[in-house]
């Protein structure tokens, strides 16, 4: 049975499929505006970054489709699990990312959600989608590397 990969101590959620589906060209750290029940739910590990993306609207950046499960003890104060959340960045950073996304084929995707000094942060990646043959090529290269590593390990 394969070992389950352990997350680094501050990591709350990770978009592992993103590196398979996209070529990540640049990364940037952003804060995220959350409600009380959202941060409590995230600290419990109930966040999912799959299929989420960021976009610039009216000079502000928003994170869409990030699922945060409702907090069990939140009763009527609970949040909408798929609500659009505002990302906290400097104006120059937002403009730079906006310019990159206007180029055809680029998008901004969240790679990781983590805590830093008690604050929830999102690692965003400026990415270009991979074609199906690119994904196959990457899997072949990974398999070849694994075989080489096994052969070298068996030798010693």
Curated annotation (Swiss-Prot):
GO biological process, one term: trans-translation
Coiled coil: none
Protein's cellular compartments: Cytoplasm
GO molecular function: RNA binding
RNA-binding among keywords: yes
Domain of life of the organism encoding this protein: Bacteria
Pfam families: SmpB
Classification via SUPFAM superfamilies: Small protein B (SmpB)
Keyword Cytoplasm among UniProt keywords: yes
Keywords, alphabetical: Cytoplasm, RNA-binding
Main location group: cytoplasm
GO cellular component: cytosol
Family: Belongs to the SmpB family.
Function: Required for rescue of stalled ribosomes mediated by trans-translation. Binds to transfer-messenger RNA (tmRNA), required for stable association of tmRNA with ribosomes. tmRNA and SmpB together mimic tRNA shape, replacing the anticodon stem-loop with SmpB. tmRNA is encoded by the ssrA gene; the 2 termini fold to resemble tRNA(Ala) and it encodes a 'tag peptide', a short internal open reading frame. During trans-translation Ala-aminoacylated tmRNA acts like a tRNA, entering the A-site of stalled ribosomes, displacing the stalled mRNA.
NCBIfam families recorded: PRK05422.1 (NF003843), smpB (TIGR00086)
UniProt protein name: SsrA-binding protein
């Amino acid at each position: 049975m394969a070992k389950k990969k352990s997350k680094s101590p501050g990591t709350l959620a990770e978009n592992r499929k993103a590196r398979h589906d996209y070529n990540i060209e640049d990364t940037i750290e952003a804060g995220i505006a959350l409600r009380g029940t959202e941060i409590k739910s995230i600290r419990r590990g109930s966040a999912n970054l799959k299929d989420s993306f960021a976009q610039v609207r009216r000079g502000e950046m928003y994170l869409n489709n990030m699922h945060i499960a409702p907090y069990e003890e939140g009763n009527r104060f609970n949040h909408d699990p798929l609500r659009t959340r505002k990302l906290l960045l400097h104006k120059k950073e937002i403009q730079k990312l906006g310019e990159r996304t206007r180029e055809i084929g680029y998008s901004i995707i969240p790679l990781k959600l983590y805590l830093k000094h008690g604050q929830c942060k999102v690692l965003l990646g400026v990415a270009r989608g991979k074609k199906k043959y690119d994904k196959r090529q990457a899997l072949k290269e990974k398999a070849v590397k694994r075989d080489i590593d096994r052969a070298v390990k068996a030798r010693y």
